[in-house]
């Protein structure tokens, strides 16, 4: 350290540094020497100049606005034309009397229907009033499954005696019987016999045999049927 200070060059550099350091600070903080104005004053001057310029321009260039005349709306409204309302007289509708439909009683239909003629070769239709036994007479020409089964059973059980065939006997026997809902054959008889006794007995026997195949029904029927014996 002593050798560093004892050196002549080093001593001269220290002296110059010591002398010029205060001068440097003096020059640095001196405003008049550098002629430096702060930014705030510059900004204030610019702002004042801008305001003066704006005031001058605004005073010189004021547009003349045309005066507008405002008309107040009048409260008087135009009167609407009054329309005359004509009174419409109501038209009186004529009442038309509708004829009432006369409903005939149920018995009138049964009376007005004409009776159909039936041949002797077809079963006879008779309607009997219900009594204590409540029988109902029917004909086998009706399209009921019950009567079809009875007719089919009679045709299968039809007996044509050999002796009657040999003697060339032919004819028709009208038979009447009652078939109950308990599947019982009652009141079997001949209403109209043929000329030959063989054919009459054969007709009664045919009904007895066929009754074994008669179907059961919920009602009791009174049936009349002709049995025809004819040689082919």
Swiss-Prot record:
UniProt keyword terms in alphabetical order = Cell inner membrane, Cell membrane, Membrane, Protein transport, Signal-anchor, Transmembrane, Transmembrane helix, Transport
Tell me the superkingdom of the source: Bacteria
Give the stretches traversing the membrane: 13-29
The TonB C-terminal domain extends over 145-232
- Give the Cytoplasmic compartment stretches of this protein: 1-12
> GO terms for molecular function, please?
energy transducer activity
Give residue ranges on the Periplasmic side: 30-232
Specify residue ranges for compositional bias: Polar residues: 59-77
Q: What is this protein called?
A: Protein TonB
């Amino acid at each position: 350290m002593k050798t560093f200070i004892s050196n002549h060059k080093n001593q001269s550099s220290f002296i110059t540094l010591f002398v010029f350091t205060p001068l440097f600070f003096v020059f640095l903080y001196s405003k008049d020497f550098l002629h430096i104005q702060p930014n705030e004053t510059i900004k204030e001057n610019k702002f004042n100049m801008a305001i003066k310029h704006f005031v001058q321009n605004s005073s010189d260039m004021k547009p003349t606005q045309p005066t507008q005349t405002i008309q107040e709306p009048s409260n008087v409204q135009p009167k609407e034309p009054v329309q005359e309302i004509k009174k419409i007289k109501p038209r009186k509708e004529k009442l038309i009397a509708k004829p009432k439909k006369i409903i005939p009683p149920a018995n009138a239909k049964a009376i007005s229907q004409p009776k159909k003629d039936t041949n002797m070769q077809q079963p006879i239709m008779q309607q009997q009033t219900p009594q204590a036994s409540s029988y109902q007479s029917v004909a086998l020409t009706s399209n009921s499954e019950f009567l079809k089964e009875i007719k089919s059973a009679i045709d299968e059980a039809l007996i044509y005696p050999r002796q009657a065939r040999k003697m060339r006997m032919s004819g028709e026997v009208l038979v009447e019987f009652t078939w109950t809902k308990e599947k019982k054959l009652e009141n079997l008889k001949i209403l109209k016999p043929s000329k030959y006794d063989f054919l009459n007995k054969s007709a009664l026997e045919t009904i007895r045999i066929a009754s074994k195949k008669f179907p059961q029904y919920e009602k009791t029927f009174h049936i009349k049927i002709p049995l025809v014996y004819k040689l082919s």
